[in-house]
Amino acid sequence: GTEFYRWGVNGPDDARKKVKKLADAGVDIIKFIDHDLMTMEEAKAAVDEAHRNGLPVVAHSHRPEEIRRGLILGVDNFEHTGLSSAPKYPDDIMDMLAERTAQMNKGPLFWTPTVEGLYNYEYLRDNPEELDDDSWHLGLPDSIITDIKQSFQHPDQLPYFQLTPIRKPTLERKFNQLREAGVVMLIGTDSGIPMKFHSQSTWKEFDVWVNEFGVDPMLAIRAAPYWPSKMMKVDNEYGTVS
């Protein structure tokens, strides 16, 4: 069933063909997940084809090898802080990040940490009345709304968040490691994970950055419209107020 929202690839030619098909269909971006399970030839073919078609490539960063390979392949942006409950990024990855961000000719390396979903889980678990807000119902049929509501009747039992109590304490350290490495951080959300909806997640990401991690508010504001428009190569149309 996953073929409806993610495509596996079987060889470099298949990778190129699928990226080209997506490009011809008008997508704005190519997203990698589990690319540490692809061959380097497959992954390189996909990245090269995306860039050939003017599309940025975003890569998951849940596992160390996803980051290493993404840096070697030249992806444009990483998503999530990743590495589960590990306390920090490995030294070799930090060295690779510093090497990449030092290359001004390649432009910025972007990173979208998506921290608020994990950071706010325990609060939401203990204050579930927030989920009564119906702003997330927009555009959904009643049957889907009912199904979603049933899915979080017992938020303390959701398997997705089992490791959150030991993952949350690692988020700020990893966030600061990335900032110190010189990546350009982007405001983005992981809307779609349990109890996280597009209608509320963005301001909560701002809140964690500024009020929990101490990011300057103006830097956080630029990380939402301006830098994402640069990463998406649409800054001539979006991203600034003038």
Indicate residue ranges for each PLM-predicted region.
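Active-site mouth loops of central-metabolism enzymes
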Residues: G1-K17, P56-V57
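Short acidic, glycine-rich surface-loop motifs adjacent to enzyme active sites
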Residues: L22-D36, D190
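Active-site core of metal-dependent hydrolases
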Residues: F32-K168, I193, G214, M232
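His/Asp/Glu-enriched, well-ordered alpha-helical/loop segment
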Residues: D156-L158, K168-S242
